[in-house]
Each structure stands twice: as C-alpha cells, then as structure tokens.
Amino acid sequence: MAKSLILHDETDCRELIKRVLLENGHEVATFAEEEKALAWTSSNPVDLAIVSLEPWMVQSRICQGLKMLSESLKILVLTSYANRELATKALEQGADDYLLKPIEIKKLEAKVRSILTKKIPTK
C-alpha cells in the first residue's frame, strides 16, 4: 500500500484526488498549505506527493524541499495548460512527472501507477 500526500489549495480537487487514491489502496494525507505539508512529511515518510503547482510554489522550490526529505519520494505535479512552463521548472527541481488540469481520473490513475513503478537509478 502506497502512502501519498496531496498538496492542493482547492478543497474539491483535494477531495477528488483523495477519493481516487483511497479507491486504489493508498493511505492519504491532504494539505492546503505548503509549510504544513513539508512539516508533516518530515516525520511521516510518503511514497508519492501530488502537488498542485502554482507560480509561487516554483519560486519556493516545493519539489526540492520534498526531495530533501526523501530522495525516493515520487512527485506528480498538477498544472493548467497555461502553466506548462511551471511544470518544466518543477521537473528540473525534482518532480517525476506532471499532469495537466482539468484532472481526468483515468489519466491520474495511470500517472500514479507509472510513477510508483519507476525504478530509481543507482549512482
């Protein structure tokens, strides 16, 4: 069973993603604020973080912060089509993949499965 974190500022989206993950056997924690998510993750390791990417989050380097807590943590960022550049920056900062909004449940499930089955390259 994967342990997952959802960081999204919109309650409805957070709850939708949570429901999908729970239906797929995940343990899930949800947060609306970056600082609370990072603080919780520092003492509660997770396998996957799904982060709704906002411009200010790239500046704060949320992906790097999460990866510093666990190199093996997988990160899926959610972004709107208009913010594709943000997704590219997030990938440069440690995100593993991205998904464009609006969220399609089947695509979300496929991305989550794909990310969690990727192997971490050995150094």
State where each predicted segment sits:
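Acidic, metal-coordinating helix/loop segments flanking the phosphotransfer/catalytic sites
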Residues: 5, 30-48, 55
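Two-component/phosphorelay signaling modules centered on CheY-like receiver
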Residues: 10-29
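Conserved phosphotransfer microenvironments
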Residues: 50-66
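C-terminal output helix
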Residues: 85, 103-112
